[in-house]
Amino acid sequence: MRKKILFVCGSMNQTTQMHQISWYLGEYDQWFTPFFSDGLLGKASDMGMLEFTIMGKKRAGRAIDYLVSNNLQLDIGGALHNYDLVVTCTDLIVPKHIKRSKIVLVQEGMTEPETILFHLARNFRWVPRWIAGTSTIGLSDTYEKFCVASEGYRDLFISKGVNPDKIEVTSIPNFDDCERYLQN
């Protein structure tokens, strides 16, 4: 039996990035889901209150359309299987049942500037990371590895408090293919 991987998608950038990463892991049983949450945020999403986020129905619909058009297996909410590995582009929200699996976090792109909300979220665990946006990516420490774009980003995340032993410089699939733009 092949080991199972769940790819947690979101925006189209995140979704296409997860798809590209999956190409290198063809020996695994791969499943995909739009971004989701549990608890209060999950309920708010179900009620349509988070349409401005990657948990909104419109963005989830776009992700699902893309995944279906590429014949990828869907597991909406990641509850069909016990996954050996979860690959995601954000740890701002980590659903409880995902925490039972090994997680690889992949940097999606640039991070937002550090504001007072960043410092609150970093210094007080009761302040949710999502309130500070992408400036707090990597601070959950719920992952086995955090794949980042460059040495510069590695240094940035370390300065924010990310465990250096968990960071791997791998580049970012959607932004590291200059050759495809030679004939645009």
Please place each PLM-identified region on the residue numbering.
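Nucleotide donor/acceptor-binding cores
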Residues: 2-4
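Active-site and donor-binding regions of nucleotide-sugar-utilizing enzymes
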Residues: 6-182
